Amino acid sequence: MRVIKLGNIDINIIRKKGFEEGSIEERIEEYCRTTASQHTDGLLERYTQLDESRNGNYINSDLMKMVYPFYAESFENRTKYNLSITNSAAVLTNEAFRRAIQRPDVQRCVFIVGPYGAGKSYFSQSLFEREEHGMLANSIVYEGSITPPAF
């Protein structure tokens, strides 16, 4: 599956979290915002290449964070920079969904929502593992939280 290329997202829709000016968290956040707004197509293409994205048919903001190599490279970085990357990943995730529903082969979207730690990701991935039944043919799966967003 190829990403529909529509150009870059507007950096102004990626909210800043208000980190202390000059802090590493603020610098990482700005890097993520800038990269998302200048390389949207490339980041979304990278997302489709992640095995867990199921060729971009599974859309999830936590997984979207993995398109940033510095974040994906270690558990320590994922813990340390999670808040700095959250809003950029959320906007990229929304853009991935927006583009996915424009694909002519997508006929439905399965939404999986629940609170943090409820097992949404496990359930979502198990749907794909049982795909021999054809249950997800021509579908995308969008997983999200029903708790207040981080931004």
How should these model regions be labeled?
Residues 1-151:
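Glycine-rich phosphate-binding loop of ATP-dependent small-molecule kinases
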